[in-house]
């Protein structure tokens, strides 16, 4: 919200400086972003009257004028502006004046004619207004008055960054209320008297969606002069709030928007067929907006229509077909309350953002419409003339918001603020904020005013009391709190432990968006319908993610495009799975995922720069799983996944249940994502790996361990893990470990076969094993794998 300090002080004028005022506003929770002067630095400029204006004898584009600036003699000034003419009131820089840029005005001759000053344009005085030629002031502008005083240019614009909950401050009225409360100062509102109707013309109004539009006011004003010029005082107020002047009708509705906080709209009455109908749009209905763009409407969009077509997207943007033009004679003024829930998000869905939608989305004072209509009518008649008809009002009282009644406990107030504020001060603060307050045994009950949609819970009242009392007035003190020991179960694996492990192995933690591009997600997780957001941040972030892999792959691409080819990332986060039986129809499951790409190690003269492969990531995943202290509980089983290479992917299985996947990204997916080179990923359900077996202390065997190596030949399709597991199944009490240490394919091994070398460790806790014990265990293992897999011992 950008506003002029001088305009604010017309409503409330506390005895504080500009710096003190902006500090007050900031400390009250309305952060001031910027304070800027409304015009450049200049002096010596006066209001003048062009008494004579004639053609320069030697220059076609110059005019010779005599200007009255309230001195004894008229000033001779040569001017080149096309709009310079006799009778004009102008801004005159007299001799000795200094304009922005340290430009000094001196006596001069232009093509032989004396010039003792300069007639100024807005730009020449450092005023940001688009205009051709010199300024044209009001005919009643006092001659000789200092121009800075005439336009009140000793003023600043204050830009406040309002939070979304403080919609009540999107106006001079709202800011004045706030400043008045902070300074215990009275707020003087402009007098708004009802405008008496002079004609009986009305337009029929029907509201078919009362929940979305509980109140709609319409008023016909005929014989309006849209060619009238917006007064300079209004243009200046609009300019200082960041709005340029367009035409008097639009300027008036914008003025009421800024002053009162009530968005309004004006229709060309001649372009309305039949009457006004406020309804929901038909799916696919089209409307051409005032900016010339065409919008295809959704069925949940509220529109203001006539009997044949949509005239405007309600509360957001007017339509071109019904807009006021230079040919307009009669207008229909609209002033309505549109429910925030029915406006919120609609503008964004059409790529629009307007001052009107910003206010309606957050909530407009629902008691403001009548006075705003009268204010706009009075200004329209004053500036453009016209004949006024009665106001037609359609209201659904049952659908209007009800004031929130909120209880505030004394104990809660003291606990949250950490300071005791006297009861009388609490009541005074709440009443100054426009609330009705009732004292109870436990504290108070406050009824929020109609302009405060954000007062809903007890903490809201605590915040209001605290910020108006002044955070600076609350003494500093150390927080007092009871320390509670965290309940930590030894069987739980803390997430921090896994994070530390991966960081120690060279990974960086990533945090990606939970919102993803839906079509891209279908490449990674085909066949599963994701939740599509009704009001997404953008089209590229319109679906809830079904897993973490998509976000990590996009992060790899982002890094590779910035000359960072070696990437090791992991992420912990939620995936969102639609489920009819889950709460709110959605399962939120914590997941752990990781990705590697590029070289195995950083570039070094003494290290080979080999590219990462499947087994690099498999080793990292095994390190995570080994935190469970039960290496026999998990396994990797060859499996296919639509996002992974069919020959380089596996399911991660724990206790017989598939809990994740690991593998190299499918070449086709690699191409579509724009990945540069081999990329390997994993994803695991966190809830399946965050528990561990509590280790038990056992005595170490004092007897020697024995190692026997066997090499078995099996089909290439047989997984080595299955062979190792088979060894453990029949190894008996003496077999302590079976480890694969070599895989060989080539000379001496039949084509289509492979040789697996396995180290068997045998040991007894009670005695030294005899050769017969060892041989018996080895023979049993060989026989079992031979029978189960058709394996044979390699010669």
From Swiss-Prot:
Sample GO molecular function, one term: tRNA binding
Locations listed in the record: Cytoplasm
Start and end residues of each FDX-ACB domain: 701-794
Stored Pfam families: B3_4 (PF03483), B5 (PF03484), FDX-ACB (PF03147), tRNA_bind (PF01588), tRNA_synthFbeta (PF17759)
Matches recorded under SMART domains: B3_4, B5, FDX-ACB
Catalytic activity: tRNA(Phe) + L-phenylalanine + ATP = L-phenylalanyl-tRNA(Phe) + AMP + diphosphate + H(+)
The enzyme's E.C. designation: 6.1.1.20
PROSITE patterns: B5, FDX_ACB, TRBD
Transmembrane segments: none
Protein family: Belongs to the phenylalanyl-tRNA synthetase beta subunit family. Type 1 subfamily.
Oligomer and partners: Tetramer of two alpha and two beta subunits.
Protein name: Phenylalanine--tRNA ligase beta subunit
Organism: Vibrio vulnificus (strain YJ016)
Underlying gene: pheT
């Amino acid at each position: 919200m950008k506003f002029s300090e001088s305009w604010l002080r017309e409503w409330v004028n506390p005895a504080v400086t500009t710096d003190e005022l902006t500090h007050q506003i900031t400390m009250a929770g309305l952060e001031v972003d910027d304070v800027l002067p409304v015009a450049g630095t200049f002096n010596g400029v006066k209001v003048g009257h062009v008494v004579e204006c004639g053609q320069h004898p030697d220059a076609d584009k110059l005019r010779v004028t005599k200007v009255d600036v309230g001195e004894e003699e008229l000033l001779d000034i040569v001017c080149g502006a096309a709009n310079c003419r006799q009778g004009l009131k102008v801004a005159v820089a007299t001799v000795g004046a200094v304009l922005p840029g340290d430009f000094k005005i001196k006596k001069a001759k232009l093509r032989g004619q004396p010039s003792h000053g300069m007639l100024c344009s807005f730009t020449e005085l450092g005023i940001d207004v688009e205009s051709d030629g010199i300024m044209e002031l009001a005919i009643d502008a006092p001659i000789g008055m200092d121009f800075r005083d005439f336009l009140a240019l000793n003023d600043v614009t204050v830009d406040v960054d309002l939070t979304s909950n403080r919609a009540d401050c999107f106006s001079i009225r709202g800011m004045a209320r706030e400043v008045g409360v902070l300074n215990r100062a009275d707020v003087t509102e402009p007098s708004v008297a009802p405008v008496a109707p002079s004609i009986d013309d009305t337009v029929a109004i029907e509201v078919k969606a009362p929940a979305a539009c509980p109140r709609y006011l319409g008023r016909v004003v005929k014989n309006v002069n849209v060619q009238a010029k917006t007064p300079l005082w209004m243009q200046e107020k609009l300019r200082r709030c960041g709005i340029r002047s367009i035409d008097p009708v639009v300027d008036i509705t914008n003025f009421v928007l800024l002053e009162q906080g009530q968005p309004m709209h004006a229709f060309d009455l001649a372009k309305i067929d039949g009457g006004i109908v406020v309804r929901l749009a038909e799916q696919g209905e089209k409307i051409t907006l005032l900016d010339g763009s065409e919008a295809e409407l959704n069925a949940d969009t509220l529109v203001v229509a006539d009997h044949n077509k949509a005239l405007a997207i309600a509360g957001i943007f007017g339509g071109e077909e019904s807009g006021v033009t230079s040919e307009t004679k009669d207008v229909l003024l609209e002033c309505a309350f549109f429910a925030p829930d029915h406006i919120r998000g609609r503008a964004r869905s059409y790529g629009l953002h307007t001052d009107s939608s910003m206010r309606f989305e957050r909530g407009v004072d629902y008691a403001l419409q009548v006075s705003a209509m009268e204010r706009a009518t009075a200004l329209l008649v004053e500036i453009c003339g016209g004949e006024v008809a009665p106001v037609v009002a359609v209201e659904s009282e049952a659908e209007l918001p009800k004031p929130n009644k909120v209880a505030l406990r004394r104990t809660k107030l003291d606990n949250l603020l950490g300071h005791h504020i006297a009861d009388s001060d609490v009541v005074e603060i709440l009443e100054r904020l426009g609330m009705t307050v009732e004292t109870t045994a436990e504290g108070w009950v406050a009824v929020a005013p109609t302009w405060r949609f954000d007062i809903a819970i007890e903490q809201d009242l605590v915040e209001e009391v605290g910020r108006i009392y002044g955070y600076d007035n609350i003494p500093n003190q150390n927080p007092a709190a009871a320390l509670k020991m965290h309940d930590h179960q030894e069987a739980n694996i803390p997430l921090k432990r896994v994070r530390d492990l991966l960081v120690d192995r060279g990974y960086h933690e990533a945090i990606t968006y939970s919102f993803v591009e839906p079509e891209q997600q279908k490449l990674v997780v085909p066949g599963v319908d994701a939740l599509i957001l009704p009001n997404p941040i953008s089209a590229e972030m319109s679906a809830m993610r079904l897993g973490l892999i998509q976000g990590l792959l996009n992060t790899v691409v982002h890094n590779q495009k910035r000359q960072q080819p070696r990437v090791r990332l992991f992420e912990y986060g939620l995936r969102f799975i639609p489920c009819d039986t889950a709460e709110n129809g959605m399962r939120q499951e914590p997941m752990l995922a990781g990705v590697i790409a590029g070289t195995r190690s950083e570039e070094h003269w003494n290290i080979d720069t080999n590219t990462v492969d499947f087994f690099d990531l498999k080793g990292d995943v095994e390190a995570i799983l080994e935190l469970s202290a039960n290496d026999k509980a998990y396994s990797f089983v060859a499996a296919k996944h639509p996002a992974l290479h069919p020959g380089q992917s596996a399911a991660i299985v724990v206790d017989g249940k598939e809990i994740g996947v690991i593998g190299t990204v499918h070449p086709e997916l690699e191409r579509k994502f724009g990945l540069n080179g081999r990329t390997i990923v994993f994803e695991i359900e966190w809830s399946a790996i965050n528990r561990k077996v509590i280790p038990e202390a056992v005595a170490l065997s004092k007897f020697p361990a024995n190692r026997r190596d066997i090499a078995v030949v099996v089909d290439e399709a047989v997984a080595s893990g299955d062979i190792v597991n088979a060894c453990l199944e029949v190894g008996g009490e003496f077999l302590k470990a079976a480890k694969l240490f070599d895989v060989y394919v080539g000379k001496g091994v039949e084509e289509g076969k492979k040789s697996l070398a396995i180290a068997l460790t045998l040991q007894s806790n009670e005695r030294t094993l005899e050769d017969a014990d060892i041989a018996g265990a080895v023979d049993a293992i060989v026989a079992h794998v031979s029978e189960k897999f058709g394996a044979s011992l390699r010669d």
